[in-house]
Regions:
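Basic- and hydrophobic-enriched, low-structure N-terminal and domain-boundary segments
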Residues: 1-164
Length: 165
């Protein structure tokens, strides 16, 4: 089952490479750095699945006062703002759905504000980070454990110099 984390927010700039998720209030205690997420969205009649990793978590006020004294006003009961958490997501992969097939595409269209964001785990985590491709090509070298408990892999082509230094 997909784990709902939050919503793509327009409180910060959204572009094809980076967006912010406004963390669901019931989920904020467990959102974590390096967590892999997925957002599904349409651009015209095209369907996309964007994957990314949370690289930063920040708290801010959701309200109209911006004097810098919200904390005192909130503690005195004067300010009715709501503290919110935003997770910065750096996009790792975008796939376009064509029929029943998902095809990697360049990052061209950002997810629109308001789209739901879900946690990625298991097989989906492998797709998000490219592990499924290197495992399929029999060039995956296990190298560690991700915060989710899943195995991380290195691509042997890079280690052996076929695709890298």
């Amino acid at each position: 089952m997909d784990e709902f984390i939050g919503t793509v927010t327009g409180l910060e700039e959204i572009n094809p490479y980076c967006f912010f998720v406004r963390v669901n209030s019931s989920y904020s205690s467990t959102v974590a750095l390096d967590q892999v997420v997925r957002v599904d969205y349409y651009w015209g009649d095209r369907e996309f699945h964007a994957y990314g990793m949370i690289t930063e978590v920040k708290a801010k006020w959701d309200g109209s006062i911006s004097t810098g004294y919200q904390e005192e006003a909130y503690n005195e009961g004067i300010y009715q703002g709501v503290p919110i958490y935003l997770g910065k997501v750096v996009v790792t992969r975008v796939l376009e759905k064509k029929g029943e097939t998902l095809i990697p595409v360049p990052y061209s269209f950002p997810p629109p504000a308001g789209e739901k964001v879900f946690g990625a785990c298991g097989e989906e985590l492998g797709v998000a980070l490219g592990f499924s491709e290197i495992r399929r090509g029999k060039r995956a070298l296990p190298c560690g454990i991700l915060p989710s408990g899943d195995v991380a892999y290195l691509d042997l082509k890079y280690i052996l110099g076929d695709n890298g230094a």
